[in-house]
């Protein structure tokens, strides 16, 4: 069985993904701020470095998959936290364990966002993240940004993350490591429970083509099943994909975009 590392697997989508993988007999390592198998603040360079070092110590023979799921919404939290955790907390963790993935021909999956959130993304912010490696400098530039527009920076980090996957996947794939993104729809998690009123209004204004019983939001298991699959060897032909698991919302909003 495989070794699967998941960030942010204490609750929500991450916890459900971990549950599915464990039921299938895999070893799962949860990296989270609290309550994880490895406790680390992935919004800091020091926290990431510590987690990466521990993974190398525990699994010198390699790991089968890295699922970068940890993140924070844009509701009333510092902009610096949104950027450091959502973007650098994913990309730098993925880079930090690349050699472990390469040893086993593994895969990496990151959590992006669906079309509703991406519509709020600012291309200048996404470009800054994708094209400048200096995290400290970026945080300096956004230190005075009002947290009230955190949803814009949330969307921008997730857009940048999806673009990072597209840019990096050809090189990673040529070295035997697949890199993909999952773009969840509106899911019933603690993050969506704490949405700002304007965020919830925007979410509820778009009808979801696929109905999930009486529930207005998807169950985390819908996302977790897709995440567990795309991280597995059964998805060996999938690389560089941003997979929308949203009940058809992306198709509704972007019906003319075929790829």
Swiss-Prot record:
pH dependency: Transformation of DCA is more efficient at pH 10 than pH 7.
Enzyme Commission number, as recorded: 1.1.1.-, 1.1.1.52
Signal peptide: none
Domain of life: Bacteria
Matching InterPro entries: NAD(P)-bd_dom_sf, SDR_fam
Molecular functions per Gene Ontology: 3-alpha-hydroxycholanate dehydrogenase activity
Chain ranges passing through the membrane: none
Main enzyme class: oxidoreductase
Function recorded in the entry: Involved in the modification of secondary bile acids into iso-bile acids (3beta-bile acids) via epimerization of the 3-OH group through a 3-oxo-intermediate. Catalyzes the oxidation of deoxycholate (DCA) and lithocholate (LCA) to yield 12-alpha-hydroxy-3-oxo-5-beta-cholan-24-oate (3-oxo-DCA) and 3-oxo-5-beta-cholan-24-oate (3-oxo-LCA), respectively. Is also able to catalyze the oxidation of cholate (CA) and chenodeoxycholate (CDCA) into 3-dehydrocholate (3-oxo-CA) and 7-alpha-hydroxy-3-oxo-5-beta-cholan-24-oate (3-oxo-CDCA), respectively. Can also catalyze the reverse reactions in vitro.
Similarity comment: family membership: Belongs to the short-chain dehydrogenases/reductases (SDR) family.
Alphabetical list of PANTHER family matching this protein: DEHYDROGENASES, SHORT CHAIN, ESTRADIOL 17-BETA-DEHYDROGENASE 8-RELATED
Protein name as annotated: 3alpha-hydroxysteroid dehydrogenase
């Amino acid at each position: 069985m495989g070794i699967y590392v998941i960030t942010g697997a204490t609750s929500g989508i991450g916890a459900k993904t971990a549950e599915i993988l464990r039921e299938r007999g895999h070893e799962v390592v949860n990296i989270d701020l609290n309550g994880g198998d490895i406790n680390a603040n992935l919004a800091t360079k020091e926290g990431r470095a510590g987690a990466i070092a521990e993974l190398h110590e525990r699994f010198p023979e390699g790991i089968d998959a890295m699922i970068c799921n940890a993140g924070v919404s844009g509701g009333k939290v510092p902009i610096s936290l949104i950027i450091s955790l959502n973007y650098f907390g994913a990309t730098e963790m993925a880079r930090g364990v690349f050699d472990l993935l390469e040893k086993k021909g593994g895969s990496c999956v990151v959590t992006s966002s669906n079309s509703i959130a991406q519509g709020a993304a600012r291309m200048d912010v996404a470009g800054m993240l994708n094209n400048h490696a200096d995290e400290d400098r970026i945080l300096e530039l956004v230190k005075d940004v009002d947290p009230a527009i955190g949803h814009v920076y949330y969307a921008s980090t997730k857009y940048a993350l999806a673009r990072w996957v597209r840019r990096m996947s050809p090189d990673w794939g040529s070295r035997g490591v697949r890199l993909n993104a999952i773009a969840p729809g509106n899911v019933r998690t603690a993050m969506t429970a704490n949405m700002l009123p304007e965020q919830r209004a925007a979410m509820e204004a778009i009808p979801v083509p696929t109905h999930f019983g009486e529930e207005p939001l998807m169950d985390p298991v819908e996302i977790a099943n897709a995440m567990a699959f795309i991280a597995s060897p059964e998805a060996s032909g999938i690389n560089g994909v941003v997979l929308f698991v949203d009940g058809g919302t992306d198709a509704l909003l972007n019906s003319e975009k075929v790829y």
